[in-house]
Amino acid sequence: MELATELKEGILLVDKPQGRTSFSLIRTLTKLIGVKKIGHAGTLDPFATGVMVMLIGRKFTRLSDVLLFEDKEYAAIAHLGTTTDSYDCDGKIVGRSKKVPTYEEILEAALYFQGEIQQIPPMFSAKKINGKKLYEYARQGLSIERRQSTVQVSLQITKYEYPLLYFSVQCSKGTYIRSIAHELGNMLGCGAYLEELRRLRSGSFSIDQCIDGCLLDRPDFDVSPYLRDFNGNIL
């Protein structure tokens, strides 16, 4: 394919559309540019949107591990009063509560999510135990013992309109925002799940540098003018 031979290596910053899996977006890009060597610096759940760092070419894909360890920033909405098995909007409802937390109670609970905290990976996650992804166990109705991990977080409450609680999070690699919503709901005594999630930043790459992921579905779309180097500069 002529396009593939002319295409530069580089970083393509994409705003992932809601409802798309991260890997379907990568497959679409692979088909569009005819280059098989494509990596990423962190996936997003299907219901989530925002910054996906796509790495094109050997020079960039071989440093994916470095970029994966960069901190990230999110805007999120938790739905209070309802819990799901997956801790997010795609899960099965497993509990409801009529308790309506006060704003003061929410601010007090949010203080826990500052600095270093311990998290247990949710069962509906891609983390592997004994060579098998946790969500594969979960779909079989199994619950596997998981080890806690240490993460760094900084959570800020931005708006509260029951049952919706809006917040932003800056966090280290491996942080589950779904778990934060779930844990916050437990602390408030009403339960909660993650309704919406948008990644605003991944390392030094921000949402305002991204192209709309829907553009990759256009067979004539040229990604070359949007490729960047590690400093975010257009190549």
Curated annotation (Swiss-Prot):
Membrane-spanning ranges: none
Pfam families found in the cross-reference section: TruB_C_2 (PF16198), TruB_N (PF01509)
Coiled-coil spans in chain: none
Keywords: Isomerase, tRNA processing
Gene Ontology terms, MF aspect: RNA binding; tRNA pseudouridine(55) synthase activity
Keyword Isomerase: yes
Residue positions of the active site: 45 (nucleophile)
Source superkingdom: Bacteria
EC number(s) given by UniProt: 5.4.99.25
Gene Ontology annotations of biological process type: mRNA pseudouridine synthesis; tRNA pseudouridine synthesis
Keyword Transcription: no
The reaction(s) this protein catalyses: uridine(55) in tRNA = pseudouridine(55) in tRNA
HAMAP family attached to this UniProt entry: TruB_bact
Role description: Responsible for synthesis of pseudouridine from uracil-55 in the psi GC loop of transfer RNAs.
Membership in a protein family: Belongs to the pseudouridine synthase TruB family. Type 1 subfamily.
Annotated protein name in UniProt: tRNA pseudouridine synthase B
Organism annotation: Chlamydia felis (strain Fe/C-56) (Chlamydophila felis)
Lineage: Bacteria, Pseudomonadati, Chlamydiota, Chlamydiia, Chlamydiales
